[in-house]
Amino acid sequence: MFQISELANYRLCKRCSGRIFAYHYHGISNLERGEYLQFAIGCETGNPDFSFVDSKNCDICHGIFDRFDDIYDLVAKKVGDAQYSTFLVGSVFPQDTIRMEEDIQKKFGSSGESIKKEFNREFGKYFSARTGKEYSQDNPDLTILVNAEYLFVDVKIRSIYIYGKYRKFRRDMPQTRWIHRPNGDTVESVIGSVFTRYAGGTNYYLHGSGREDVDVRMLGNGREFVLEVENPRYREFELDPVVKEINTSGKGVEIFDVKFSSHDAVSEVKLEKHRKVYDALVVSDRPIDESRLLEACINLTGKNIYQRTPLRVAQRRSDLVRTRRIDQVDLVGVSANEAEILISAEAGTYIKELVNGDGGRTRPSLSEMYGSPLNVKELDVIKICRGED
């Protein structure tokens, strides 16, 4: 059984001594608890002048709780004029300090709390009092990480997320930026660069509900996306001017139904799988037999097809055979060696390969049913069949 007076053998301040018994005598602070312990030790040892060491000489905290003003100034300098409403505090202490505290607490019954927990709580109270911002563990706008040993701070500003839908009117534009193609417009850059400027952010990422090929236009009711802007200085701003600037830029992208969203929307958008309707301009190396093509379209309607990963994407996709349903294939018209066809198909269907057969990797294909090679000359997505559309 330990005696309280044994605490006098350690170089501890009042706060760190009180924290050893944090789960006793509720309703008081660790500093107040340390005051009681100091008095009790003085009585137990017959030394009324006994006192714990000053915090700056404490072997556990080294006076970190007296440096809140300095830490605040470091945080304020890093945050600058960035907007935020909620914040969270985290901290890093030397492992030697953590182990020493744990050993002492074990000796006295292991009923204390860690210095990290108290620091995070107390600096959080201090920071909230100075800024008027709310301490929150639930998705905070600002996360503060304090290195107590070196008095270094790092801050992380939570990204903002903007939901919307886009149309793409060009046949030379990928959806997202490529590492091997850093220059040139993309849907991501056309949208993201403008939003990032308005938000005062440092980078951006477009998360789309699927993607169309570079040479495929996205028309009709548009494709859903969530744009993530990293390290925004401004969390709230008018969206209409941003939308107008993007839509009048002449870069071939139009956005609509735009609103602020959350990180959860990223996974929601990416997980959604919707049937799509395509307008395909199909070409043959000889004049097209309209009646044969019409029969092929009718025969392909309602069929399940089997698609092995296309050769054009095999280097970056798993080599699998996928089953896809073709809901409707309608022949719109024929002109010489070209034909316009409307195709409604399950999400994930490779439409170009549905038409050309990809050397037998897609079966049945329109070419197979027509009895002669066909290829897609131009392709547009004209509708994504979402529930609300």
UniProtKB/Swiss-Prot annotation:
Active-site residues, record numbering mapped to chain: 213
UniProt KW keywords: Isomerase, RNA-binding, tRNA processing
One Pfam family hit: Pus10_THUMP_arc
Catalytic activity line of the entry: uridine(54) in tRNA = pseudouridine(54) in tRNA; uridine(55) in tRNA = pseudouridine(55) in tRNA
Main enzyme class: isomerase
InterPro entries, alphabetized: PsdUridine_synth_cat_dom_sf, Pus10, Pus10-like, Pus10-like_C, Pus10_THUMP_arc
Biological role stated in the UniProt entry: Responsible for synthesis of pseudouridine from uracil-54 and uracil-55 in the psi GC loop of transfer RNAs.
Family, per entry: Belongs to the pseudouridine synthase Pus10 family.
Protein name in UniProt: tRNA pseudouridine synthase Pus10
Species in which this protein is naturally found: Thermoplasma acidophilum (strain ATCC 25905 / DSM 1728 / JCM 9062 / NBRC 15155 / AMRC-C165)
Lineage: Archaea, Methanobacteriati, Thermoplasmatota, Thermoplasmata, Thermoplasmatales
